[in-house]
Amino acid sequence: MIYKLKLIFLIFFLYGHVAHAISIEDFKNLEGQSSFKVQKVNKYIDYFSQNRKGRDFFQAAYPRLGLYKDIIYEIFDEYNIPREIIFVSMLESGFNPKIESSAGAIGLWQFMPSTAEIFGLRIDEWVDERMDIYYSTNAAVSYFRSLLKKFGSWELALAGYNCGDLN
């Protein structure tokens, strides 16, 4: 959980202006141009670039970004959500809309049933809108906006999203 939050912060706050260049090699190359030297953050860069498990995850998730980014960016742009927030989905689900966690979170944005209900996603015997790109992204936007309003900063909103259920 902590590594996800740190990587989100890394992508969003340290490299947000260049997030269109989303390869681990690009991030590693930018390190020399940046003034930050935070060892813990570098550990996660190394995890996704040098560790086989991290590299495999990134290499599987990154190509799926192209399948969904236009839809997600359109929704984000409509509500003035920073495009870099898309990487929350990468870390939560690897951009797999059908994935289910052991805790029961489902979809690109890994909504738990209770949170999905709060944000208007339909879950019944016929449909689970957590797996729908359009509906789940709109719900995620509502969730992010409520967290931003509650906490007043993206740093805390992202941490709140990571904690789940508006805790």
Features from the language model and the residues they span:
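N-terminal secretory signal peptides that target proteins for export/translocation
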Residues: M1-I2
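Short, intrinsically disordered, charge-balanced linker/junction segments flanking boundaries
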Residues: G164-N167
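Substrate-binding clefts and substrate-entry loops adjacent to catalytic sites
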Residues: D46-P63, F95-S102, Q110-G152, L156
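Short, functionally critical alpha-helical segments immediately adjacent to catalytic or ligand/cofactor-binding
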Residues: I81-P97, A157-N162
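Sec-dependent N-terminal signal peptides
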Residues: L5-Y15
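An acidic, Gly/Ser/Thr/Pro-rich helix-cap/linker signature
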Residues: H17-N80
